[in-house]
Amino acid sequence: MASNSDLVRAVESFLGVSLGDSVSDSLLLIATTSAAVVVGLLVFLWKKSSDRSKEVKPVVVPRDLMMEEEEEVDVAAGKTKVTIFFGTQTGTAEGFAKALAEEIKARYEKAAVKVVDLDDYAADDDLYEEKLKKESLVFFMLATYGDGEPIDNAARFYKWFTEGKDERGIWLQKLTYGVFGLGNRQYEHFNKIGKVVDEELAEQGAKRLVAVGLGDDDQSIEDDFSAWKESLWSELDQLLRDEDDANTVSTPYTAAILEYRVVIHDPTAASTYDNHSTVANGNTEFDIHHPCRVNVAVQKELHKPESDRSCIHLEFDISGTSITYDTGDHVGVYAENCNETVEETGKLLGQNLDLFFSLHTDKDDGTSLGGSLLPPFPGPCSLRTALARYADLLNPPRKAALLALATHASEPSDERLKFLSSPQGKDEYSKWVVGSQRSLVEVMAEFPSAKPPLGVFFAAIAPRLQPRYYSISSSPRFAPQRVHVTCALVYGPTPTGRIHKGVCSTWMKNAIPSEKSQDCSSAPIFIRPSNFKLPVDHSIPIIMVGPGTGLAPFRGFLQERYALKEDGVQLGPALLFFGCRNRQMDFIYEDELKSFVEQGSLSELIVAFSREGAEKEYVQHKMMDKAAHLWSLISQGGYLYVCGDAKGMARDVHRTLHSIVQEQENVDSTKAEAIVKKLQMDGRYLRDVW
């Protein structure tokens, strides 16, 4: 047993104080007791910290562009500030914005170029006007999605800019601008956002530099962007060249192929990122950049065994998180590429999938590599993880990716890659890549000598894997701890004979729920708010049109109405037009829908079966059968909701609505168009389409 003096020395050492040479037993007791209390407190705090580390926190998904926190960056004397804004859904608009920035910097020494995510431009709506007044030359890269809506990171700016125009009047006389829109001509509201912003800028006093560019992703949006860029240079020469060299011809510009610096790490020092673990980041809300990893609680097949297709019902468990949602919202899901795709890509790259590495935007000496694109993942991880979670491997590659591949091809025959990426190879690219739906992996397999280093592959060839969005098929009143998803499996042959498997739907098809195994599947998710909402007044009639998985948000609506009715709320009439092929194969949620009718939350269920009778019957045919009743409900102030395929079903339903208005109101086509337009403007004709 230690002597008192030894114990005193130990206590002194622990407390970091001197107790003197003569210490009484009572003082020693106090000191040792204090030490014990301190030790106990430290152990308690460590344990609490350890427990807290298990709490659900956001997964950090790095942003392509990190905006400076400080205010306006000073522009050097003699320089002209050029700001390029982007609003992107899949990263294409952002890529175009950065490509434009690099070319402007290369062509014009006096240009001080900055690329800005519209969502980061102003922390508060009140700052938009103040900041825009300081701009002189701007460009907007704006994508349109769904039913002519702005994408997430441009929605706040778009709402502010278009809704407050009357108050501001003409105030942008000092601003010169250009707009390039990204859309798909197959959709009804082709490039609506780009067109509207272009028109509004002019109406609010700004000077249009060139005509709005209309990128069509149904063809070659890269060619559209290149053509629009070419129209810029003669105009920018007047603004960004000095008088003495205004007439000189610019040196032909060749875009540099971006590349990250790769650092190899010891695989035994596995990073937490390799497990895609949750990481604290200070955010109190989850969003596209800070999703939350949650478990799959339930997964089941909705089609009957007789069906040759598949539709999955999946439930994410959000208990213990701060995730909340409203009926009608969307959920974004970060899924993973399947093992088969990852293995094949690893072989094509000639790399070990267990390679543990990180990507960096600076050189060994700390200087910048020149690009502004941050790595697609935030820390060291294995190549297997990087390919599974962060690389888009199954979409057709862009032309810029083919050019990057070509620079690392060793076989003369692989020179074809350069041709495909060139203006001369436009038709061949459209046919061989886009028309044949060749994925990046397929293209790499066709040109096996092209083995780019990982720094080039992740910077210039494989885009970041984007989240997939689904209409939530539940109501928080009915399922507050769950987010339900209804997902059709994407599976089928491409023109090349390859079987295309949708990334997220395949993941959901193979997901293991917690009700079947503790080792269940999980995914990072976030909620995207939607304006697809039930009327605030629950007595207002509603008409819902949603064949197939278009039923998803209406299942949430009906759960909501079920809960409201159980609480004694008086409900207005509700009609649901649903469509499927055959009641014996793909009549999803059949029992639930019938129970909603029995309980009274659904007034009438009208189903169109397209493969049962001699003639195909679709929801629009059933709408015409019920034209008088349908229009009567709308005339009483009712709401019409449509969900599903934008290119086919939603367009047909829209035309049917026009026909119903003409017939029931006895008006011509122009007047019917005006009536339908007013329904949309009043928020009584809502569409959730893709």
UniProtKB/Swiss-Prot annotation:
Localization per record: Endoplasmic reticulum membrane
Coiled-coil blocks: none
Residues that, per the record, bind NADP(+): 309, 549, 610-611, 616-620, 652
PTM per Swiss-Prot/TrEMBL: Glycosylated.
Main location: endoplasmic reticulum
Flavodoxin-like domain location: 82-233
Membrane topology, from the record: Single-pass membrane protein
Binding locations of FMN: 88-93, 143-146, 182-191, 217
Reactions catalysed according to its record: 2 oxidized [cytochrome P450] + NADPH = 2 reduced [cytochrome P450] + NADP(+) + H(+)
CDD domains: CYPOR
Cofactor: FAD; FMN
Keyword Oxidoreductase: yes
Keyword Endoplasmic reticulum: yes
Residue ranges occupied by any FAD-binding FR-type domain in the UniProt entry: 289-535
Lumenal membrane side: 1-25
The EC number(s) this enzyme carries: 1.6.2.4
Cytoplasmic side: 47-690
Binding site for FAD: 468-471, 486-488, 502-505, 690
GO molecular function: flavin adenine dinucleotide binding; FMN binding; NADP binding; NADPH-hemoprotein reductase activity
GO CC terms: cytosol; endoplasmic reticulum membrane
Keywords: Endoplasmic reticulum, FAD, Flavoprotein, FMN, Glycoprotein, Membrane, NADP, Oxidoreductase, Transmembrane, Transmembrane helix
Annotated TM spans: 26-46
Known function: This enzyme is required for electron transfer from NADP to cytochrome P450 in microsomes. It can also provide electron transfer to heme oxygenase and cytochrome B5.
Family: Belongs to the NADPH--cytochrome P450 reductase family.
Descriptive protein name: NADPH--cytochrome P450 reductase
Organism of origin: Vigna radiata var. radiata (Mung bean)
